[in-house]
């Protein structure tokens, strides 16, 4: 009899403790020792958690790399107007990084800390991003009309002040909510009877959306402010306005979809379990919109010089002084080389080799035309004075029996001067150029 009673008690234990077995049952992909709070991070049956954290992890890495690139490109930014926006853009990247991190708080099951972080950081992080867009749009409206905008610290201060407004709103809302209900929440997120509708996890979906009205106002301001930038006089700033406009249009579409789903769709289909996936997907989608349509295009444009700087670079190119430059200038001067085959003998002192660097003083050299004797002879009498025209050779200027039979330029010049001093009989000066190597 005792054996039968013991057997019945062992078989009846599972019937009396079904809750204990249910608590030890872990979803596929999760360890039995894992806290049930983190089951969505590894649950393969509901893949939305794994996909969301994978997308958020890739976004965190991408945003971190883009932040490093933007900060490292600061010394290479030549346009001072773009450099003044770097502080605001880094602030925008920090807000985007926070949105990717907040995705994990939405994947984890509701708890007092996770619910409080969602309620507070959701609006603050979006306010950071949209405030930076509003400040950028404000600067672009000045740049497209005057090609000169506010200082960098002014733009950053505008973005910071707009963000502080949302910080104050969320802080007051969260404090009032917690103090009024005492914040009594069970470890698994089950709200006690004394704190119903007063804890962060017990806030209605409609109330959560209503607390984001200021953030929606910032988004609408950035969207409307981006349109005038497309009509400015300075067209090179229009593409930045297009980046902001495209980002805000997609963000508005994302916000409309998730708000409708969060406040109306889930209640109509009686699926409150889709509240967390809705927030996680909205965060990841909007953060990637910021990265793809605003951050990456702005980073690619930040180091490009302004048209004024490009024009100055073309007008005043950098020119180095070196051996190659001297050779090019000497080559340019060699186009007027004297033909030595038809030149007369010159004194030996004139034939000394001259260094190509003797006349170089560090400045740009110019080619100087030095005509030869043959060129002067072919110019004619009307182009120069009579005393520079080379004389013709005569039989009286040189003794045929001398040892040196070469005509010297000095003797020819003396004979020619004598002939010029004796005018012709008709009283006119006539210049007859004869071959100096043919005797009269």
Swiss-Prot record:
Q: Kindly list every residue the record annotates as glycosylated.
A: 190
Taken from the UniProt entry, a GO cellular component term is:
receptor complex
Its transmembrane ranges are 50-70, 85-105, 120-140, 156-176, 208-228, 241-261, 279-299
The stretches that face the Extracellular side, renumbered to this chain, are: 23-49, 106-119, 177-207, 262-278
The lineage, from the top, is: Eukaryota, Metazoa, Chordata, Craniata, Vertebrata
Q: What is this protein called?
A: G-protein coupled receptor family C group 5 member C
Output the Gene Ontology terms for molecular function. G protein-coupled receptor activity; sevenless binding
Q: Which domain of life is it from?
A: Eukaryota
Q: Which residues lie on this side of the membrane: Cytoplasmic?
A: 71-84, 141-155, 229-240, 300-440
Species of the source? Mus musculus (Mouse)
Q: Keywords, A to Z?
A: Cell membrane, G-protein coupled receptor, Glycoprotein, Membrane, Phosphoprotein, Receptor, Signal, Transducer, Transmembrane, Transmembrane helix
One Pfam match: 7tm_3
Q: Where in the cell is it found?
A: Cell membrane
